[in-house]
């Protein structure tokens, strides 16, 4: 019999699952009644903070996100709590000064976070250095994420090279962050095997069901040796969210990868979340379109959240009929901007520029400041060079920086 290697699971229902399906609108009061049972499961961790939860709590729910974190920490006695952190962008959409990054990391860990998953939208590791260093200083677990995407520059050698650098940075683990559901099953197997051979760190896999491949990709990744997978309780699984926790637990039952999780307990947790899902469906907060398979994410390499944002932008402009034109424009803009992964904030920047290019009838006639900042190097270095003609049209002869963008930012704590 094969050697036992129980698969570990990070539960996303309190963060990415509801962020992906109901625009991050789950309230603290909706979370608290079930966390005692969730604490009994034996999860590797529960992702419950960071990402869009901070913004959404303040902007839409009128909640204090710090109070949410403290209440969750109080309720989870045994389970590690995890957050998503946008590197130098913290939980925002632009780079902040080092002192702000350090302070935010310190406060996150002090208020209850154990594991910080840190990523950069360009995979520019310089934008992660401060957050990783701060996490280590506070005795937190620093997990660095590879923002996974497709393109001829993104070879296995590319990912292996970055993974080795991440290990050298002092990270505690690596996450393959497949925010668009682009990682198909056999590619998942190849990538996990390559990373496991190249580095000694635990490897975690995060994906979305958007393209319909996620569960199959998890199966192949687990067989290839991945250590942890991200899953969501079934009422908030599938579609633009993650594979269902209960399904993955059952899949590996009786195999060397058996998690040992109690399905009866998981069913009780699922029963709690089901009425919340039904309520979201009835109110329109949960759009049924977000629950199906969207093959366009593979064709256009656009994450599910970005698809819904594009639809919303075009509806507000009275230009819903331009949707497919914009979808076709997205890969072109992405190529012009150095072919970055499409994840916050690069997904918003590329998407908005694509909309403007189509609506204005002329490419780069209207250029937001964020696009200019990308082309000026103020978000970091991309895997490929910028389109020189586009760069000239957008920023003229303005200086293009090649050093770490945050080196230009004066300390901000005194003015915040």
Predicted regions, residues:
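Short, well-ordered coil/turn segments that N-cap beta-strands
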Residues: 4-7, 42-44, 77-81, 112-115, ...
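Conserved, mostly hydrophobic/aromatic
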Residues: 9, 17, 38, 118, ...
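N-terminal amphipathic alpha-helix/helix-capping segment at the start of soluble metabolic enzymes
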Residues: 1-22, 72-74
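Catalytic cores of alpha/beta
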Residues: 154-166, 211-227
